[in-house]
């Protein structure tokens, strides 16, 4: 259903100079080293120091802070919204809708004016649907792709959360004619519904080099969107 049960954050401290210790600042709880036996000592105000011994440090911990993008998943059977638990074992036409809400809002100056902008995220959602249960599988136009190996339908959906709002805020709604979706849908006919794991990954790196305040960048955005959807 997309309800959050636990938030785990992973950090990678690169030790390119081979230092004996690495200082970091974190507000994570239950911090643990996930790729070595290096230890750390805690200081004040979230400061920690890792005994790196020349190595990179990979650690993770939990947080109760808001995620930069919230994911809502809604399930329908024959047009009626239903929980996946209630859908288990049933047959009919199924629709699964993923919605992405960007919460990473901040204020920046554009042409001397304070403007609310988002950190744009590329959201990739993937799942595998067994071909003996799911037929006539379709995905949202322009925002997904289906790959079949005969036994399974492999689904990949792409969404660009916060990007359209940034472009509209930077250039004006009348100058942005790109169809950028913040949702993704799958429809299919199903026999004996069951669903294995779905995976959603978000990254802000894809558009990190694009200046939304440049008209030329809009062409770059269109090209990048097309490349990701067609990949």
Q: PLM features: residue spans?
A:
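Cytosol-facing boundaries of transmembrane alpha helices in integral membrane proteins
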Residues: 1-231
């Amino acid at each position: 259903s997309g309800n959050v049960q636990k938030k785990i954050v992973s950090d990678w401290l690169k030790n390119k100079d081979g230092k004996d210790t690495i200082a970091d600042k974190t507000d994570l709880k239950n911090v643990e080293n996930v790729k070595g036996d290096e230890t750390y000592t805690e200081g004040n105000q979230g400061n920690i120091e890792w005994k790196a011994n020349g190595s990179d440090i990979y650690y993770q911990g939990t947080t109760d802070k808001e995620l930069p993008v919230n994911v809502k998943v809604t399930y329908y059977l024959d047009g009626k919204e239903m929980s996946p638990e209630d859908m288990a074992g049933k047959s009919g036409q199924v629709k699964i809708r993923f919605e992405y809400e960007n919460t990473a809002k901040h204020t920046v100056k554009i042409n001397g004016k304070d403007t609310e902008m988002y950190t744009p995220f590329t959201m990739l959602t993937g799942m595998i649907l067994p071909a003996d249960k799911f037929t006539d599988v379709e995905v949202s136009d322009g925002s997904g792709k289906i790959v079949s190996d005969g036994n399974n339908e492999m689904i990949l959906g792409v969404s660009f959360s916060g990007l359209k709002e940034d472009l509209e805020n930077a250039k004006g709604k009348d100058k942005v004619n790109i169809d950028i979706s913040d949702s993704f849908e799958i429809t299919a006919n199903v026999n004996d519904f069951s669903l294995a794991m779905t995976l959603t990954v978000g990254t802000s790196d894809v558009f990190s080099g694009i200046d939304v305040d440049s008209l030329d960048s809009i062409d770059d955005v269109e090209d990048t969107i097309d490349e990701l959807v067609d990949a």
